[in-house]
Protein backbone atom coordinates (compact mmCIF):
# COMPACT_ATOMS: atom_id res chain seq x y z
CA UNK A 1 0.00 0.00 0.00
CA UNK A 2 1.38 3.42 -0.97
CA UNK A 3 1.36 5.93 1.88
CA UNK A 4 0.34 9.52 1.12
CA UNK A 5 3.03 12.02 2.02
CA UNK A 6 2.48 15.15 4.06
CA UNK A 7 2.23 18.29 1.92
CA UNK A 8 5.53 20.10 2.12
CA UNK A 9 7.21 22.73 -0.08
CA UNK A 10 9.90 21.76 -2.57
CA UNK A 11 13.18 22.91 -1.04
CA UNK A 12 15.62 20.69 -2.95
CA UNK A 13 16.10 20.28 -6.70
CA UNK A 14 18.03 17.12 -7.48
CA UNK A 15 19.79 16.30 -10.76
CA UNK A 16 20.15 12.54 -10.88
CA UNK A 17 17.47 9.91 -10.28
CA UNK A 18 19.79 7.02 -9.43
CA UNK A 19 20.00 4.78 -6.41
CA UNK A 20 22.87 6.60 -4.72
CA UNK A 21 21.16 9.94 -4.17
CA UNK A 22 17.94 8.25 -3.07
CA UNK A 23 19.87 6.27 -0.44
CA UNK A 24 22.08 9.20 0.57
CA UNK A 25 20.73 12.75 0.11
CA UNK A 26 17.03 11.86 -0.03
CA UNK A 27 17.45 9.58 2.99
CA UNK A 28 19.00 12.56 4.81
CA UNK A 29 16.13 14.85 3.80
CA UNK A 30 13.67 12.35 5.25
CA UNK A 31 15.67 12.31 8.48
CA UNK A 32 15.72 16.11 8.65
CA UNK A 33 11.95 16.17 8.12
CA UNK A 34 11.43 13.58 10.87
CA UNK A 35 13.91 14.88 13.43
CA UNK A 36 14.95 18.46 12.70
CA UNK A 37 11.93 20.33 11.30
CA UNK A 38 13.40 20.78 7.81
CA UNK A 39 9.93 20.54 6.25
CA UNK A 40 10.95 20.09 2.63
CA UNK A 41 10.58 17.87 -0.41
CA UNK A 42 12.97 16.88 -3.19
CA UNK A 43 12.02 17.37 -6.83
CA UNK A 44 14.17 15.05 -8.93
CA UNK A 45 15.30 15.83 -12.48
CA UNK A 46 16.38 12.97 -14.73
CA UNK A 47 19.14 14.82 -16.63
CA UNK A 48 19.50 12.57 -19.68
CA UNK A 49 17.19 10.54 -21.91
CA UNK A 50 14.25 11.45 -24.11
CA UNK A 51 11.68 10.21 -21.59
CA UNK A 52 11.44 8.97 -18.02
CA UNK A 53 13.09 5.61 -17.41
CA UNK A 54 11.03 2.70 -16.01
CA UNK A 55 12.45 3.22 -12.47
CA UNK A 56 11.53 6.93 -12.63
CA UNK A 57 8.02 6.07 -13.79
CA UNK A 58 7.72 3.49 -11.01
CA UNK A 59 8.69 6.09 -8.41
CA UNK A 60 6.16 8.57 -9.79
CA UNK A 61 3.46 5.90 -9.76
CA UNK A 62 4.10 5.55 -6.04
CA UNK A 63 3.80 9.29 -5.46
CA UNK A 64 7.52 9.46 -4.69
CA UNK A 65 7.17 7.04 -1.76
CA UNK A 66 9.74 4.26 -1.42
CA UNK A 67 11.78 2.35 1.16
CA UNK A 68 15.45 2.22 1.99
CA UNK A 69 17.04 -0.94 3.37
CA UNK A 70 20.29 -0.41 5.26
CA UNK A 71 22.17 -3.70 5.48
CA UNK A 72 25.55 -4.35 7.04
CA UNK A 73 27.52 -4.82 10.23
CA UNK A 74 27.10 -2.45 13.19
CA UNK A 75 29.03 -3.01 16.44
CA UNK A 76 29.97 -6.47 15.22
CA UNK A 77 26.42 -7.59 14.46
CA UNK A 78 24.61 -7.88 11.12
CA UNK A 79 21.67 -5.49 10.78
CA UNK A 80 18.91 -4.98 8.22
CA UNK A 81 16.88 -1.78 8.67
CA UNK A 82 13.83 -1.00 6.51
CA UNK A 83 12.72 2.65 6.51
CA UNK A 84 10.00 4.61 4.73
CA UNK A 85 10.93 7.63 2.63
CA UNK A 86 8.40 10.34 1.78
CA UNK A 87 10.94 13.02 0.83
CA UNK A 88 10.57 12.84 -2.97
CA UNK A 89 7.84 14.90 -4.62
CA UNK A 90 8.21 13.56 -8.19
CA UNK A 91 10.66 12.88 -11.01
CA UNK A 92 10.82 15.03 -14.15
CA UNK A 93 12.57 14.37 -17.45
CA UNK A 94 14.79 17.34 -18.35
CA UNK A 95 14.37 16.89 -22.09
CA UNK A 96 10.65 16.13 -22.21
CA UNK A 97 9.53 18.36 -19.31
CA UNK A 98 11.93 21.30 -19.37
CA UNK A 99 9.23 23.91 -18.84
CA UNK A 100 8.24 22.20 -15.59
CA UNK A 101 11.89 21.86 -14.55
CA UNK A 102 12.40 25.58 -15.17
CA UNK A 103 9.23 26.38 -13.22
CA UNK A 104 10.83 24.62 -10.26
CA UNK A 105 13.70 27.11 -10.36
CA UNK A 106 11.16 29.88 -9.84
CA UNK A 107 9.75 28.38 -6.64
CA UNK A 108 10.32 30.77 -3.71
CA UNK A 109 10.68 27.73 -1.42
CA UNK A 110 13.62 26.30 -3.39
CA UNK A 111 16.99 26.71 -1.68
CA UNK A 112 19.24 23.72 -2.47
CA UNK A 113 20.43 21.96 -5.63
CA UNK A 114 22.11 18.55 -5.35
CA UNK A 115 23.46 16.40 -8.15
CA UNK A 116 25.13 13.16 -9.12
CA UNK A 117 25.61 13.21 -12.88
CA UNK A 118 28.77 11.00 -12.90
CA UNK A 119 32.35 12.22 -12.98
CA UNK A 120 31.91 13.32 -16.60
CA UNK A 121 28.77 15.31 -15.80
CA UNK A 122 30.49 18.47 -14.61
CA UNK A 123 32.09 19.64 -17.84
CA UNK A 124 31.95 22.72 -20.04
CA UNK A 125 31.36 21.85 -23.69
CA UNK A 126 30.54 24.85 -25.83
CA UNK A 127 27.14 24.65 -27.47
CA UNK A 128 26.19 21.36 -25.79
CA UNK A 129 23.29 20.85 -23.39
CA UNK A 130 25.39 19.72 -20.44
CA UNK A 131 24.36 19.58 -16.80
CA UNK A 132 26.18 22.88 -16.01
CA UNK A 133 24.39 24.56 -18.93
CA UNK A 134 21.05 23.37 -17.55
CA UNK A 135 22.02 24.89 -14.19
CA UNK A 136 22.95 28.17 -15.89
CA UNK A 137 19.55 28.27 -17.62
CA UNK A 138 17.73 27.63 -14.34
CA UNK A 139 19.69 30.34 -12.57
CA UNK A 140 18.88 32.72 -15.41
CA UNK A 141 15.16 32.02 -14.89
CA UNK A 142 15.46 32.44 -11.12
CA UNK A 143 17.43 35.70 -11.45
CA UNK A 144 14.80 37.08 -13.83
CA UNK A 145 12.15 36.31 -11.20
CA UNK A 146 13.97 38.39 -8.58
CA UNK A 147 14.40 35.46 -6.20
CA UNK A 148 17.31 34.76 -3.81
CA UNK A 149 20.28 32.65 -4.86
CA UNK A 150 20.67 28.91 -4.35
CA UNK A 151 23.07 26.62 -2.49
CA UNK A 152 24.70 23.88 -4.59
CA UNK A 153 25.82 20.55 -3.13
CA UNK A 154 27.19 18.46 -6.02
CA UNK A 155 27.96 14.85 -5.10
CA UNK A 156 29.95 13.87 -8.20
CA UNK A 157 33.16 12.01 -7.34
CA UNK A 158 35.63 14.63 -8.51
CA UNK A 159 37.87 16.82 -6.39
CA UNK A 160 36.53 20.29 -5.61
CA UNK A 161 33.23 19.44 -7.32
CA UNK A 162 31.56 22.67 -6.17
CA UNK A 163 34.32 24.84 -7.60
CA UNK A 164 34.24 22.86 -10.85
CA UNK A 165 30.48 23.27 -11.23
CA UNK A 166 30.67 27.01 -10.55
CA UNK A 167 33.42 27.47 -13.17
CA UNK A 168 31.41 25.63 -15.82
CA UNK A 169 28.18 27.51 -15.05
CA UNK A 170 29.92 30.89 -15.21
CA UNK A 171 31.57 29.93 -18.50
CA UNK A 172 28.15 29.38 -20.09
CA UNK A 173 26.93 32.67 -18.65
CA UNK A 174 30.01 34.38 -20.08
CA UNK A 175 29.19 32.89 -23.49
CA UNK A 176 25.81 34.65 -23.26
CA UNK A 177 27.47 37.94 -22.32
CA UNK A 178 25.16 38.33 -19.31
CA UNK A 179 27.31 40.25 -16.82
CA UNK A 180 24.41 40.96 -14.46
CA UNK A 181 23.58 37.26 -14.15
CA UNK A 182 27.24 36.40 -13.60
CA UNK A 183 27.52 39.01 -10.83
CA UNK A 184 24.35 37.69 -9.13
CA UNK A 185 25.62 34.09 -9.24
CA UNK A 186 28.99 35.11 -7.79
CA UNK A 187 27.34 37.19 -5.06
CA UNK A 188 24.16 35.32 -4.13
CA UNK A 189 24.77 31.64 -4.96
CA UNK A 190 26.96 29.30 -2.91
CA UNK A 191 28.75 26.34 -4.48
CA UNK A 192 29.94 23.91 -1.80
CA UNK A 193 32.38 21.12 -2.57
CA UNK A 194 31.44 17.80 -0.97
CA UNK A 195 32.73 14.35 -0.19
CA UNK A 196 30.20 11.51 -0.03
CA UNK A 197 30.79 8.11 1.53
CA UNK A 198 28.24 5.31 1.50
CA UNK A 199 28.18 2.08 -0.48
CA UNK A 200 24.81 1.73 -2.21
CA UNK A 201 24.01 -1.63 -3.79
CA UNK A 202 20.73 -0.55 -5.39
CA UNK A 203 17.97 -3.05 -5.97
CA UNK A 204 17.89 -6.12 -3.72
CA UNK A 205 18.41 -9.61 -5.09
CA UNK A 206 15.19 -11.55 -5.87
CA UNK A 207 15.27 -13.58 -2.65
CA UNK A 208 15.71 -10.46 -0.51
CA UNK A 209 13.04 -8.62 -2.51
CA UNK A 210 10.54 -11.39 -1.72
CA UNK A 211 11.46 -11.24 1.96
CA UNK A 212 11.03 -7.47 2.10
CA UNK A 213 7.70 -7.68 0.29
CA UNK A 214 6.47 -10.10 2.96
CA UNK A 215 7.62 -7.76 5.74
CA UNK A 216 6.14 -4.65 4.14
CA UNK A 217 2.92 -6.17 2.90
CA UNK A 218 3.65 -4.84 -0.60
CA UNK A 219 6.29 -5.11 -3.31
CA UNK A 220 8.21 -1.84 -3.56
CA UNK A 221 9.92 -1.72 -6.96
CA UNK A 222 11.62 1.53 -5.94
CA UNK A 223 13.25 0.07 -2.81
CA UNK A 224 16.99 0.80 -2.61
CA UNK A 225 19.63 -0.97 -0.52
CA UNK A 226 22.74 0.56 1.03
CA UNK A 227 25.08 0.09 3.96
CA UNK A 228 24.36 1.62 7.38
CA UNK A 229 27.60 3.61 7.32
CA UNK A 230 27.39 7.08 5.85
CA UNK A 231 29.58 10.17 5.94
CA UNK A 232 29.06 13.56 4.33
CA UNK A 233 31.69 16.30 4.24
CA UNK A 234 30.63 19.77 3.08
CA UNK A 235 33.22 22.47 2.45
CA UNK A 236 31.65 25.82 3.22
CA UNK A 237 32.96 29.33 2.49
CA UNK A 238 33.92 31.65 5.37
CA UNK A 239 30.96 33.32 7.05
CA UNK A 240 28.32 31.00 5.55
CA UNK A 241 26.39 29.04 8.19
CA UNK A 242 25.04 26.11 6.19
CA UNK A 243 24.13 24.17 9.32
CA UNK A 244 21.57 26.84 10.24
CA UNK A 245 19.71 26.08 7.00
CA UNK A 246 20.49 22.39 6.55
CA UNK A 247 20.17 20.75 10.00
CA UNK A 248 21.84 17.47 9.13
CA UNK A 249 23.70 17.13 12.42
CA UNK A 250 20.52 17.78 14.41
CA UNK A 251 18.88 14.98 12.41
CA UNK A 252 21.60 12.54 13.47
CA UNK A 253 23.42 12.51 10.13
CA UNK A 254 27.17 11.83 10.17
CA UNK A 255 28.19 15.16 8.63
CA UNK A 256 31.14 17.53 8.89
CA UNK A 257 31.00 21.18 7.82
CA UNK A 258 34.56 22.38 7.24
CA UNK A 259 36.53 25.10 5.44
CA UNK A 260 38.95 22.41 4.16
CA UNK A 261 37.78 18.93 3.20
CA UNK A 262 41.15 17.64 1.96
CA UNK A 263 42.08 15.74 5.17
CA UNK A 264 38.77 13.85 4.95
CA UNK A 265 39.34 13.03 1.29
CA UNK A 266 42.80 11.76 2.18
CA UNK A 267 41.31 9.67 4.99
CA UNK A 268 38.81 8.00 2.67
CA UNK A 269 41.28 7.36 -0.15
CA UNK A 270 43.94 5.94 2.15
CA UNK A 271 41.90 3.94 4.67
CA UNK A 272 38.98 2.67 2.59
CA UNK A 273 40.38 2.57 -0.94
CA UNK A 274 44.04 2.09 -0.03
CA UNK A 275 43.43 -0.92 2.20
CA UNK A 276 41.49 -2.51 -0.66
CA UNK A 277 44.17 -1.86 -3.26
CA UNK A 278 47.03 -3.01 -1.01
CA UNK A 279 45.37 -6.34 -0.22
CA UNK A 280 43.18 -7.40 -3.15
CA UNK A 281 45.95 -8.81 -5.44
CA UNK A 282 47.21 -11.11 -2.67
CA UNK A 283 43.63 -12.10 -1.87
CA UNK A 284 42.89 -13.05 -5.47
CA UNK A 285 46.08 -15.11 -5.72
CA UNK A 286 45.11 -16.83 -2.46
CA UNK A 287 41.86 -18.00 -4.05
CA UNK A 288 39.37 -15.62 -2.44
CA UNK A 289 36.56 -13.99 -4.44
CA UNK A 290 34.90 -11.44 -2.09
CA UNK A 291 36.10 -8.87 0.43
CA UNK A 292 34.01 -10.30 3.29
CA UNK A 293 35.82 -13.64 2.85
CA UNK A 294 39.15 -11.88 3.30
CA UNK A 295 38.09 -10.15 6.51
CA UNK A 296 36.83 -13.48 7.90
CA UNK A 297 40.21 -15.13 7.24
CA UNK A 298 42.57 -14.80 10.26
CA UNK A 299 45.65 -14.04 8.14
CA UNK A 300 44.00 -11.33 6.08
CA UNK A 301 42.10 -9.90 9.03
CA UNK A 302 45.40 -9.33 10.84
CA UNK A 303 46.88 -8.00 7.61
CA UNK A 304 44.08 -5.43 7.22
CA UNK A 305 44.51 -4.31 10.84
CA UNK A 306 48.27 -3.80 10.47
CA UNK A 307 47.79 -1.76 7.30
CA UNK A 308 44.96 0.35 8.73
CA UNK A 309 46.13 0.97 12.29
CA UNK A 310 49.93 0.81 12.01
CA UNK A 311 50.81 2.03 8.53
CA UNK A 312 48.03 4.28 7.20
CA UNK A 313 46.99 5.71 10.57
CA UNK A 314 50.03 7.96 11.25
CA UNK A 315 49.96 9.48 7.74
CA UNK A 316 46.48 11.04 7.98
CA UNK A 317 46.34 14.51 9.55
CA UNK A 318 43.15 14.29 11.60
CA UNK A 319 42.36 13.83 15.33
CA UNK A 320 43.29 10.39 16.67
CA UNK A 321 39.75 9.49 17.75
CA UNK A 322 38.30 10.38 14.33
CA UNK A 323 40.91 8.28 12.53
CA UNK A 324 40.44 5.30 14.85
CA UNK A 325 36.65 5.37 14.52
CA UNK A 326 36.92 5.54 10.73
CA UNK A 327 39.48 2.72 10.53
CA UNK A 328 37.23 0.52 12.68
CA UNK A 329 34.25 1.37 10.47
CA UNK A 330 36.26 0.30 7.41
CA UNK A 331 36.73 -3.18 8.88
CA UNK A 332 32.99 -3.44 9.58
CA UNK A 333 32.19 -2.29 6.05
CA UNK A 334 34.59 -4.84 4.57
CA UNK A 335 32.86 -7.55 6.64
CA UNK A 336 29.38 -6.64 5.34
CA UNK A 337 27.78 -10.01 4.42
CA UNK A 338 25.24 -8.28 2.15
CA UNK A 339 27.75 -6.35 0.02
CA UNK A 340 29.32 -9.13 -2.12
CA UNK A 341 32.26 -6.95 -3.18
CA UNK A 342 34.04 -8.97 -5.86
CA UNK A 343 37.82 -8.83 -5.64
CA UNK A 344 38.28 -8.92 -9.41
CA UNK A 345 35.96 -5.93 -9.83
CA UNK A 346 37.91 -3.93 -7.25
CA UNK A 347 41.17 -4.96 -8.94
CA UNK A 348 40.26 -3.09 -12.14
CA UNK A 349 43.11 -0.73 -13.13
CA UNK A 350 45.12 -1.66 -10.04
CA UNK A 351 48.32 -0.02 -11.32
CA UNK A 352 46.85 3.49 -11.42
CA UNK A 353 44.95 2.81 -8.18
CA UNK A 354 48.14 1.76 -6.39
CA UNK A 355 49.82 4.99 -7.48
CA UNK A 356 46.97 7.15 -6.08
CA UNK A 357 45.82 5.11 -3.08
CA UNK A 358 48.95 3.43 -1.69
CA UNK A 359 52.13 5.18 -2.87
CA UNK A 360 51.40 8.56 -1.18
CA UNK A 361 50.94 6.73 2.14
CA UNK A 362 54.30 4.98 1.73
CA UNK A 363 56.04 8.28 0.97
CA UNK A 364 54.44 10.04 3.94
CA UNK A 365 55.26 7.12 6.25
CA UNK A 366 58.92 7.24 5.19
CA UNK A 367 58.98 11.00 5.75
CA UNK A 368 57.43 10.67 9.21
CA UNK A 369 59.10 7.46 10.46
CA UNK A 370 62.32 7.23 8.47
CA UNK A 371 61.53 3.64 7.49
CA UNK A 372 59.29 1.76 5.07
CA UNK A 373 55.80 0.51 5.99
CA UNK A 374 56.41 -3.21 5.52
CA UNK A 375 52.95 -4.40 4.47
CA UNK A 376 52.22 -1.54 2.07
CA UNK A 377 55.66 -1.93 0.49
CA UNK A 378 55.20 -5.68 0.09
CA UNK A 379 51.84 -5.00 -1.55
CA UNK A 380 53.84 -3.89 -4.59
CA UNK A 381 55.29 -7.41 -4.85
CA UNK A 382 51.78 -8.86 -4.81
CA UNK A 383 50.77 -6.34 -7.47
CA UNK A 384 53.63 -7.58 -9.69
CA UNK A 385 52.65 -11.21 -9.12
CA UNK A 386 49.02 -10.47 -9.91
CA UNK A 387 49.92 -8.66 -13.15
CA UNK A 388 51.71 -11.79 -14.36
CA UNK A 389 48.37 -13.64 -14.43
CA UNK A 390 45.53 -13.66 -16.94
CA UNK A 391 43.11 -12.19 -14.37
CA UNK A 392 44.26 -8.60 -14.96
CA UNK A 393 41.81 -6.00 -16.26
CA UNK A 394 43.66 -2.80 -17.15
CA UNK A 395 44.37 -0.58 -20.15
CA UNK A 396 45.70 -2.39 -23.25
CA UNK A 397 49.04 -0.57 -22.88
CA UNK A 398 49.54 -1.66 -19.27
CA UNK A 399 48.47 -5.25 -19.97
CA UNK A 400 50.82 -5.46 -22.96
CA UNK A 401 53.72 -4.09 -20.92
CA UNK A 402 53.37 -6.68 -18.17
CA UNK A 403 52.94 -9.46 -20.74
CA UNK A 404 56.44 -8.57 -21.97
CA UNK A 405 57.68 -9.92 -18.60
CA UNK A 406 59.68 -6.90 -17.43
CA UNK A 407 61.98 -7.23 -14.43
CA UNK A 408 60.75 -5.83 -11.10
CA UNK A 409 63.37 -3.06 -11.26
CA UNK A 410 62.23 -2.09 -14.75
CA UNK A 411 58.65 -1.79 -13.51
CA UNK A 412 59.75 0.28 -10.53
CA UNK A 413 61.65 2.68 -12.78
CA UNK A 414 58.59 3.43 -14.95
CA UNK A 415 58.01 7.04 -13.90
CA UNK A 416 55.08 7.25 -16.32
CA UNK A 417 53.27 4.63 -14.21
CA UNK A 418 54.18 5.82 -10.71
CA UNK A 419 55.09 9.49 -11.06
CA UNK A 420 58.60 8.78 -9.75
CA UNK A 421 61.35 6.15 -9.85
CA UNK A 422 60.39 3.78 -7.04
CA UNK A 423 63.95 2.45 -6.80
CA UNK A 424 64.92 5.90 -5.49
CA UNK A 425 62.95 5.22 -2.29
CA UNK A 426 65.57 3.90 0.17
CA UNK A 427 65.13 0.17 0.73
CA UNK A 428 62.03 -0.15 -1.47
CA UNK A 429 63.55 -2.34 -4.21
CA UNK A 430 65.24 -4.62 -1.66
CA UNK A 431 62.00 -5.09 0.31
CA UNK A 432 60.08 -5.92 -2.87
CA UNK A 433 62.79 -8.35 -4.00
CA UNK A 434 62.67 -10.08 -0.62
CA UNK A 435 58.89 -10.42 -0.82
CA UNK A 436 59.08 -11.82 -4.35
CA UNK A 437 61.65 -14.41 -3.26
CA UNK A 438 59.36 -15.83 -0.60
CA UNK A 439 56.86 -18.66 -1.03
CA UNK A 440 53.99 -17.82 -3.36
CA UNK A 441 51.64 -20.78 -2.82
CA UNK A 442 48.11 -19.44 -2.25
CA UNK A 443 46.84 -19.92 1.30
CA UNK A 444 43.72 -21.76 0.20
CA UNK A 445 45.83 -24.31 -1.64
CA UNK A 446 47.71 -25.01 1.62
CA UNK A 447 44.63 -25.10 3.82
Where are the model-predicted features located?
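Substrate/ligand-engaging "lid" and interaction regions
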Residues: 1-447
Amino acid sequence: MVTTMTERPVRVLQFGEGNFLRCFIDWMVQRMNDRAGFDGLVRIVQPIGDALTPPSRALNARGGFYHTCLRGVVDGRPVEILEENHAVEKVLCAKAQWDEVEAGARLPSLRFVVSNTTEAGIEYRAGEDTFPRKVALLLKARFASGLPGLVFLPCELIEHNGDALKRCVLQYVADWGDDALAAWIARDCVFCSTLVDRIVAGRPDPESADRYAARLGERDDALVCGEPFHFFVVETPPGFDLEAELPLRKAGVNVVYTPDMQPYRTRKVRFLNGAHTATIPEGILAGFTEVAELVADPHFNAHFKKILFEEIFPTVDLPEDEKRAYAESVLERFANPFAHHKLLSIALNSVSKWKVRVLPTILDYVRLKGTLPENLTRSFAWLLRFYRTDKVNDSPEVVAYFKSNPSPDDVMRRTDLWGLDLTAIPGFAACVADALAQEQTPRRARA
